[in-house]
Curated annotation (Swiss-Prot):
Family membership noted in the UniProt record: Belongs to the TRAFAC class OBG-HflX-like GTPase superfamily. OBG GTPase family.
Stated role: An essential GTPase which binds GTP, GDP and possibly (p)ppGpp with moderate affinity, with high nucleotide exchange rates and a fairly low GTP hydrolysis rate. Plays a role in control of the cell cycle, stress response, ribosome biogenesis and in those bacteria that undergo differentiation, in morphogenesis control.
Coiled coil: none
Protein name, as recorded: GTPase Obg
Taxonomic lineage from the root: Bacteria, Bacillati, Bacillota, Bacilli, Lactobacillales
Enzyme class: hydrolase
Keywords carried by this UniProt record: Cytoplasm, GTP-binding, Hydrolase, Magnesium, Metal-binding, Nucleotide-binding
Gene name per UniProt: obg
Principal place of residence: cytoplasm
Database matches in Pfam families: DUF1967, GTP1_OBG, MMR_HSR1
Swiss-Prot/TrEMBL cofactor(s): Mg(2+)
Cystine crosslinks: none
Domain Obg stretches: 2-160
Length: 437
């Protein structure tokens, strides 16, 4: 049986911006030509695109790293380097993307053709033509390209079924699916026969069609990961209608009503919104001895939880193996689907807030200072490290510009306040220099 892979961890890296160029106009009859170095091109983005033709995340099992191309370097004559093409990564419909480092949901990809930029490419570094001023008409300054965004991601694929079959193991879900659809699930008289979702399409006599998922068997404690646990619950989140299958024969000595309550408790514990989905109770194995008596007892117990103004869930007595009562069940399911809207999987607060990629966050410190064991000073911080990465250290003027930027950020004053002395070693990454007081 082919394996259904519904989670995958991958790494994406957008392209680096191309380096800016230092060049000067040197042409006959053009004395003292000015700066002519162009900007680097923009690095490629990594873009997720929903492809309804994909059904699993299996491809990501063998291909876990995705890197977009870098932008081209700037050229002479003030010409910009070519920007890199975006890297398109196709994902199945229904993929949820999380930040693997924080666990926060980044996006939920549910519409065919939907696009989402998951990693932004770096901007190109500026060439020396951009740094010309009246005081410095021939600057030997250029910038390196900005690094592309890099992210560790976790992908989750939830079964895109309209209807989910839930119930304790071996209540007859797989048999029911096999007789109402063309699906061929593995069927057996032991717990956890179904360990991955089985999908099938139903077409009623009236012409309605919908997708049904026979989901892995559930036991008490699933919301805490017992048994197949949260794997099961993850698959049911997308279904709009739940068919709650119960074994009315009580052949294993179980009480159908206790099973019904236990499974609903697990659904509610995992995600309160799961209980908002309408349920149809499927009283299965009605061809077995004493099933009628068990069903009547179940109805009495169920009624005690509802007052006279509340509507009880619909109950359909069937026998999957004997093909009894199926037509009425399917017509009622199609009718309920027709009037049931799609459910949001998460509250809006679960999603990461969109921020401008190059935006300024005033609450975020621009740099941090720490002391190494060898008494050197260590500078760190996203903004500072970005400036460092984009500095062309092959050019003296670029190095001097970087030093001015550090002073403008208050690095010199902060080092002095921490006790830095003339000649102390200061490090940024692998680069080191002497502090001059």
């Amino acid at each position: 049986m082919s394996m259904f892979l519904d989670t995958a961890k991958i790494k994406v890296k957008a392209g680096k911006g191309g380096d800016g160029m230092v060049a000067f106009r040197r042409e006959k009859y053009v004395p003292n030509g000015g700066p002519w170095g162009g900007d680097g091109g923009h690095g490629g983005n990594v873009v997720f695109v929903v492809d309804e033709g994909l059904r699993t995340l299996m491809d990501f099992r063998y291909h876990r790293r995705f890197k977009a191309d870098d932008g081209e370097k700037g050229m002479t004559k003030g010409m910009h380097g070519r920007g890199a093409e975006d890297l398109i990564v196709r994902v199945p419909q229904g993929t949820t993307v999380r930040d693997a480092d924080t666990g926060k949901i980044i996006t939920d990809l549910v519409e065919n053709g939907q696009e989402f930029v998951i990693a932004h490419g770096g901007r190109g570094g500026r060439g020396n033509i951009r740094f010309a001023t009246p005081k410095n008409p021939a600057p030997e300054i250029s910038e390196n390209g900005e690094p592309g965004e890099e992210r560790n991601l976790e992908l989750e694929l939830k079964v895109l079924a309209d209807v989910g079959l839930v119930g304790f193991p071996s209540v007859g879900k797989s048999t029911l699916l096999s007789v109402i659809t063309a699906a061929k699930p593995k069927i057996g008289a032991y717990h956890f026969t179904t360990i991955v979702p089985n999908l099938g399409m139903v077409r009623t006599k009236s012409g309605e069609s919908f997708a049904v998922a026979d989901l892995p068997g559930l036991i008490e404690g699933a919301s805490q990961g017992v048994g197949l646990g949260t794997q099961f619950l993850r698959h049911i989140e997308r279904t709009r209608v739940i068919l709650h299958v119960l074994d009315m024969s009580a052949s294993e000595g179980r009480d159908p009503y206790e099973d019904y309550v236990a499974i609903n408790n697990e659904l509610e514990t995992y995600n309160l919104r799961l209980m908002e989905r309408p349920q149809i109770i499927v009283a299965n194995k009605m061809d077995m001895p004493e099933a009628e008596e068990h069903l009547e007892e179940f109805k009495k117990k169920l009624a005690t939880n509802y007052d006279e103004f509340e509507e009880l869930p619909q109950i359909f007595p069937i026998s999957g193996i004997a093909h009894q009562g199926l037509e009425n069940l399917l017509e009622a399911t199609a009718e309920l689907l027709e009037k049931t809207p799609e459910f949001l999987l998460y509250d809006e607060s679960d999603f990461q807030e969109e921020e401008a990629y190059y935006g300024f966050n005033p609450d975020e410190p621009e740099f941090a200072i720490s002391r190494a064991d060898d008494a050197s000073w260590i500078l760190s911080g996203d903004k500072l490290e970005k400036l460092f990465t984009m500095t062309n250290f092959d050019r003296d003027e670029s190095v001097m510009k970087f030093a001015r930027q550090l002073r403008g950020m208050g690095v010199d004053e902060a080092l002095r306040a921490r006790g830095a002395k003339d000649g102390d070693i200061v490090r940024i990454g692998k680069f080191e220099f002497e502090f001059v007081d």
